Amino acid sequence: VTQSVIRAALELLSDKIYKIILYGSYARGDFDLESDVDIMIILDCSLEEIRAYRKEVSRIASRISLANDIEVSLLLIDRRSFEERLDILPFYQNVLREGVALYG
């Protein structure tokens, strides 16, 4: 599943990708049959560009979910916002601390 996400993300977003991080239960190793695969894609681009990609990224997540019979959640964020939120929001701190870098 993660390799499919990386391939699709690189095809769509190529040089804009800063990092791809697997986070949540699959990254921690405490997943079960009901768990989804949580992946954050951090981009070096503007918020406007991210908005333009959201619909296609949602399609990618749906396609991979259906093909693998598992829910795939893809979260897009720009690098600047991610770094700003790191200092104040525990969610982003957890992603960085517990996450597994898949790319970048």
Across the structure, where does each feature detected by a protein language model lie?
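Catalytic core of pol beta-like nucleotidyltransferases
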Residues: 1-19, 27-33, 44-104
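Short beta-strand->loop micro-motif that forms the acidic, two-metal-ion catalytic signature
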Residues: 37-42
